[in-house]
Amino acid sequence: MEPLDQRRTDSDQEEGFGVQSRRATDLGMVPNLRRSNSSLCKSRRLLCSFSSEKQENLSSWIPENIKKKECVYFVESSKLSDAGKVVCECGYTHEQHIEVAIKPHTFQGKEWDPKKHVHEMPTDAFGDIVFTGLSQKVGKYVRLSQDTSSIVIYQLMTQHWGLDVPSLLISVTGGAKNFNMKLRLKSIFRRGLVKVAQTTGAWIITGGSHTGVMKQVGEAVRDFSLSSSCKEGDVITIGIATWGTIHNREALIHPMGGFPAEYMLDEEGQGNLTCLDSNHSHFILVDDGTHGQYGVEIPLRTKLEKFISEQTKERGGVAIKIPIVCVVLEGGPGTLHTIYNAITNGTPCVIVEGSGRVADVIAQVAALPVSEITISLIQQKLSVFFQEMFETFTENQIVEWTKKIQDIVRRRQLLTVFREGKDGQQDVDVAILQALLKASRSQDHFGHENWDHQLKLAVAWNRVDIARSEIFTDEWQWKPSDLHPMMTAALISNKPEFVRLFLENGVRLKEFVTWDTLLCLYENLEPSCLFHSKLQKVLAEEHERLAYASETPRLQMHHVAQVLRELLGDSTQLLYPRPRYTDRPRLSLPMPHIKLNVQGVSLRSLYKRSTGHVTFTIDPVRDLLIWAIIQNHRELAGIIWAQSQDCTAAALACSKILKELSKEEEDTDSSEEMLALADEFEHRAIGVFTECYRKDEERAQKLLVRVSEAWGKTTCLQLALEAKDMKFVSHGGIQAFLTKVWWGQLCVDNGLWRIILCMLAFPLLFTGFISFREKRLQALCRLARVRAFFNAPVVIFYLNILSYFAFLCLFAYVLMVDFQPSPSWCEYLIYLWLFSLVCEETRQLFYDPDGCGLMKMASLYFSDFWNKLDVGAILLFIAGLTCRLIPATLYPGRIILSLDFIMFCLRLMHIFTISKTLGPKIIIVKRMMKDVFFFLFLLAVWVVSFGVAKQAILIHNESRVDWIFRGVIYHSYLTIFGQIPTYIDGVNFSMDQCSPNGTDPYKPKCPESDWTGQAPAFPEWLTVTLLCLYLLFANILLLNLLIAMFNYTFQEVQEHTDQIWKFQRHDLIEEYHGRPPAPPPLILLSHLQLLIKRIVLKIPAKRHKQLKNKLEKNEEAALLSWELYLKENYLQNQQYQHKQRPEQKIQDISEKVDTMVDLLDMDRVKRSGSTEQRLASLEEQVTQMGRSLHWIVTTLKDSGFGSGAGALTLAQRAFDEPDAELSIRKKGEEGGDGYHVSARHLLYPDARIMRFPVPNEKVPWEAEFLIYDPPFYTAEKKDATLTDPVGDTAEPLSKINYNVVDGLMDRCSFHGTYVVQYGFPLNPMGRTGLRGRGSLSWFGPNHTLQPVVTRWKRNQGGGICRKSVRKMLEVLVVKLPQSEHWALPGGSREPGKMLPRKLKQVLQQEYWVTFETLLRQGTEVYKGYVDDPRNTDNAWIETVAVSIHFQDQNDVELKRLEENLQTHDPKESARGLEMSTEWQVVDRRIPLYVNHKKILQKVASLFGAHF
């Protein structure tokens, strides 16, 4: 067998990643290397060149911290270089050595030793690397010593190279020579590898050279870079190569750093060296001072990967250790050694089947039982996949391969075979993530911790598909509270599919949402979020208000409520009231740092702190929905809205918030997305309301006006109006409700003519001429019917119309007929009438049923255009009245009042918006008015330009301003409508109609004329030309443009006119719904009554229940439950409609076809497997028949029937030579491997001793194994009196008596008499691959005692806990600080002693005798051989396991035991030997040594307990 160092050199032309051996030096965690803000790292990505300052820092830091290796002693080697030159033992030529090495005075005459003659010096190769002629891509590189600390390398990569801490480490290993892969498999591998790296933020580590698997990885990254955008980020590919094997490495040497270093990829001239791959982003070039020696980087790569995997990465709000996975393509012996080391150290491996050689050999046998993986089978596979080099394999190598492959396959939980198109694996990324989850599941953790770790991985990588299939299974039942931290992480990182998954698996939002949770969510808003900046503004304003406060105000929920009120409108109340001092939230953050760094807070600790914290929220679903909406998270908001109860109001509120945010959003794309999402939520509100209205009109209309406590005591209708959701308001059900309100208690079937007749002759009300909606009104007294009629808004409206028309007629009469110096009675009546209008407008201004305050009501009042018009008309009337009452200004007063009459007439437009015919037309007119204003700007340009030019050409020095205005503006404007000026040319030129000097104020100044004054002096051709051009553009072009604008506006508005009219109709209905029934001026009586109620009686204002109704709790709960039920119907209908879409049907059909193909493939595989099983069964039957025939023949021969010569030779052969493969298979099926496993691990624990490989079939001593030559190892013990002598011969051991009790030492085996060969006892379980006694104390059996101390696990009430009906046990275990596993408190015993030494260390001495009594009274659960990694061919461990169970928690002996457990010992702690004891739950995942687990399982079985 080859030594370990030799096998490492065999990987010269292979890429392998080294996995650290189990005894490698432990490395501590890096302090403060994890940066909290990844955005700082992203600004320093690999494609960005260093600034001069950074280059200087790097040029000073690297030489101080990173070294290279140089040979300092030239010793001529017997070998020549490839060029035939003399080289040193290090491989470099004479010229490549430093001057000190050529003249070494210190080492003269000594043999070359790399440990002595290779020294470290500051590195001279680092910086940026650019590959000449290939691309402008800039990478990073560094040359460093093989002894460089992993901490330093990690610091270089993360702090100086600017790499983000990875979420995953992918180590790709395999063939270093170029090999062929099927195109489809190559494409799948490249796509999957880059996909998993890009989606998880992984680092890919390879050998970095431009050959083999490294080249495949580089090309995969190249293809991704060419096809992706800059936003998708970069794939970090790190090549770790040997400096001495790199071709053209001289180009990389720059003592002050290469910025950049130009490297040429020269494959033709590389010879036995290799070139760096141009598609890698970073290179770590490991230097040991030699040239041409491959594999130098493996130890450093091993340590670096191990170190990185021990770091903690926090992503998506969860903290996990950086997982590592090994991906294998092709490969040879070195790759096999790499896989073996990886599996041994617990690193999961993904084998790509179809890539060739080692990968295919392992993939072919991975599904077989270990007992079926024989030497002959491996030999057969090698002959198939290693055809060219199969003849070079020695028998020892084949045996070693068999043993390693058996050990690899034995740990199936770490082995994943990727097969193209099989096992549901569509891509390599799925296989990689499944491998990590499978490995995580196999770790020795208690159930919750293990599954929690798997879920962290899935959330961090955003792989909900794997979480569904691998984590949320029947194997583990999740508690909703366990999912809360992951739920928060999924929300913060915007992973809606995970939120949906958690909700499906029992997370209740009422329990999830607490004060702490909400604060955590709002503190983690993205800085780019508009709501984030609004919060900052609120906090800054509060800080300015509290000028005396030295500390910056901290974020609290009432700050959020302030911003939300701005968005929802002041008609809503604050959603989160300002807390009292004692209610101040525990999580808070200063204003400049609202963005909470998730890496700084443990979500698990957050939920531990908030356990039992009473939620303050009315509706937790609302809180999460608002949080999702303000960030414009579409899918997340949709999922949360589906959980809401008050869903119609929620959808309308979301629409309002989004529309308000879109107005302030500067990013156009984000603004459009917000508007689209607002429309989507409006459609959802319409959909739910439609379902409700179809089911029950009355209850649906109750939903519209129900006061929603959750949304600031507003109503659905009010939210829709605030959000201007015209589609919702124009819904038939809402319009029916508004019509119902409009008609009051009257039936809507009453014709308008009936209403008018009753208004003119109200006694008709007593005849049944008018029908009422409620039958009871039909039978009520006349006064009640009159009150119901005149309180109807429709009646109030028409009474006000009649009153208003009367007012306008009277006003016109006074202005035109009866406007006397002293006001007449008619004019006084107008004054009274106007006073009543003023009183009504004042009532509307101060009407505040919701308690919003005067300022807010004034703001709302003046936001309406018609109110502004009313106030303007009233103020103008007061101005005109003031002038009219002053005799000197009587006429100006009449003019003002005349203009005011126009404004009062315009008010009619608002009145007629209720009309279905006139209302839409009024809307169109309003929109066209906007077009006119834009048109006037264009028209003014032509009018002013032509008017000024014309006036300047025709008239000289006109000084009268009024005539300048007429000439420039007025005449030019009239010209558009056909009034062409006569003096523009000389045909109609006349001086009679003008004033020559401009002295006549009623005549224009004459144009320029000749000296006679009879002919024009201006150029007629010019003025005519200007006139024609002006008419062409102004009269034809601009007027037609205006017509086109009107036409476009008409068509655009006409499509939505009905919606707009229905939306605006509400305002008029609401106005007259709350208006006093009497029309002006009789309305003064109503105002007097109102004044008495408000001022004298102090009765507050109340809103009519028809528009805002606060329901009783029971009624509201029933109504919301009904709405929730119908919302589910709506969602189901939406889902059904989605499935019925053609594109969705095509996708479903495609998926079904793919599933069918997979099923057919699986069926074919099953049929093939079934055929093999049937053949095997047939073989077994034939063998049994042969044995039976042989028995018959033997019996007949013994009975004297024939000689038996030559009879049934087939049966005899079947009996004598049974099928070996069938026998092995049967044995494997019956008892697994059937042999010890841990005792055959190649690397012996606590020593760098490699065992001789022993495959399963060669374990029994009876099996012939001619090449078996195990090494001899016996460790020296400090106390030689307690161990057998050391020696590899039998002479020192001649005095030992085996198979008997030798003095105080019991050398008898529980398995009977064992064989002693050449003075050494032989392990009764077979070969182990190592002779001697190893680290054990005695040759032969080493007897141990394992006391299993158990008690029942009890809850707080004292009851026994159960799991899956079975009771749960707790066991007493111990642990050394250096150990990763716990152990039973037993072990080896000193000769003649009963208690193990380990047990004595944890028990106080006065309790030893009592515990011995407990042991004698205990139950023996196991006695026999222990499969321990310390076992050898000549020494092994046998144990007796005794169960000591305490049935009662109040057992006196149990209490005494707990009292006598050893306490903290400072001396032992200083030596690192202090043991810790703990009661742990008995479970199959308990982190216990494997052989102790088997014992514990027997104890659990003894008591019928859970395991």
UniProtKB/Swiss-Prot annotation:
Stored PROSITE patterns: NUDIX
Activity modulation: Activated by intracellular ADP-ribose, beta-NAD (NAD(+)) and similar compounds, and by oxidative stress caused by reactive oxygen or nitrogen species. Ca(2+) and PI(4,5)P2 are required for channel opening by ADP-ribose. Activation by ADP-ribose and beta-NAD is strongly increased by moderate heat (35 to 40 degrees Celsius). Likewise, reactive oxygen species lower the threshold for activation by moderate heat (37 degrees Celsius). Activated by moderate heat (35 to 40 degrees Celsius).
Extracellular domain ranges by topology: 815-825, 887-894, 949-968, 984-1020
Topology of this chain in the membrane: Multi-pass membrane protein
TM segment ranges: 794-814, 826-846, 866-886, 895-915, 928-948, 1021-1042
CDD domains with a match to the protein in the record: NUDIX_ADPRase_Nudt9 (cd03670)
Modified residues (Phosphothreonine): 739
Intramembrane region coordinates: 752-768, 969-983, 1078-1096
Modification comment: Phosphorylation of TRPM2 at Thr-739 by protein kinase C (PKC) counteracts the effect of cytosolic Ca(2+) and elevates the temperature threshold.
Alphabetized InterPro entries for the sequence: Ion_trans_dom, NUDIX_hydrolase-like_dom_sf, NUDIX_hydrolase_dom, TRPM, TRPM_SLOG
Domain Nudix hydrolase: 1351-1502
Tissue specificity as recorded in UniProt: Detected in pancreas beta-cells. Detected in fetal brain cortex neurons (at protein level).
Biased composition annotated in UniProt, kind: Basic and acidic residues: 1-11
Cytoplasmic side: 1-751, 769-793, 847-865, 916-927, 1043-1077, 1097-1507
Family according to the record: Belongs to the transient receptor (TC 1.A.4) family. LTrpC subfamily. TRPM2 sub-subfamily.
Subunit structure: Homotetramer.
Name of the protein: Transient receptor potential cation channel subfamily M member 2
